[in-house]
Structures are given as structure tokens and as C-alpha cells.
Amino acid sequence: LCQLLEAFAREGVHIMLKDFSLNMPLPTVAAIAWDPSTLGQSSEIVFTAGTAASPAKAAIRAVTEVAQLAGDFCTNACYEASGLSKFNTLEEAAWLFEGPSVSLDSLPTVEDSDIRQELLTALDGLRPMTMYAVETTHQRLGIPTHYTIVPGMAFRERDRNQSLGLFVGRKLVEEADAATALDGLKVLEECYPKAHF
């Protein structure tokens, strides 16, 4: 982590980490980064977060996400926000700079040499909430994947008016055949009669 932060500093990119764990069993670290020499001209503010079994891994995940989204901070490229706010000015992000400083060691951890034990500890820490995992493994590729849902927690969707219905509707329109999409959209209309989508 120190080497990653030093690499940003060498390039003149400012980066700040923030605890976003919110009393959850897993540590979540947010990272906000900007290059003051190019901000507003050829670069933008990048805001990401990482969650992992340990605070250090969560921070590394957030910082590498900054690098992935921001490229080199000088190409006029824009990134698409992935669930978190996209700030145009540091003033919009001022709330991130407020609050106490905490050490990474003070964040929660479920770190264990056995990933199964990490998952069980995280699940236990989420009680009384229930987590559901939907298998999404591609049959030909055979690489195990899943989508995780915890009812009652915020749903990550790129819309100011986030909604599971909006997400399902978009997936229907993008991926289903016309008849299936129409049937699904009728069900959504019944479930969300006054929805904006």
C-alpha cells in the first residue's frame, strides 16, 4: 500500500483514503484522487472504494481502482462512475475531507488463511440480514462467478434513483428476446406502478 501511495505522490497526484466500513463486518476504504496541476483541464476527480477481508487489502483495492479508472490523469479521458458519486469539483467532495483520522488497524477485519472462514465470519457479522448468492457462471468458460444480494442494503446502480426494478428492466431490454422482455416489463409495471422508469 505504501508503495502504491508513493507512486501517486511521485506523479503529483493527491490521494486521500477514508473509512467507509459503516459498522459492517468487512472493511471498506474509499479513495479520492486528483492531480492539482491538470484538474479541470485534462483530468478529473476520481472517487472509488474497495472492500476486502483486511483493511490493507481494502485500501489497495480502492487505490488500484483509482489507477484503473483514471488512467494517467492527463489525457482528457473520462471515467464512468461505478456506484459512487462523481465529483466535478473538490468543493462537491468537501464532506469526504471532514471527520476524524483513523488508522487502518482500527477498521474491522475477517482476514484468515482460509477464504471459507473469511466468508463465514463476514456472513455471521451481517446477521440478522440474510445474504443470497446467485450463480452467474458462464457455462462455456466455467469460471465460478456469482452476484450477491443482501435485502435491505443499497443496490449499486448507475442512476440517481436507484431501484432493483430499474436494473431488472434494463437487463430485460438489453438481453431478453422481445416477448420475454414485454412480459417482464408488464410484471415490473405491476410491482412499480409509479416508477420513473
Across the structure, where does each feature detected by a protein language model lie?
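Helix-biased "structured C-terminal domain" signature
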Residues: 1-197
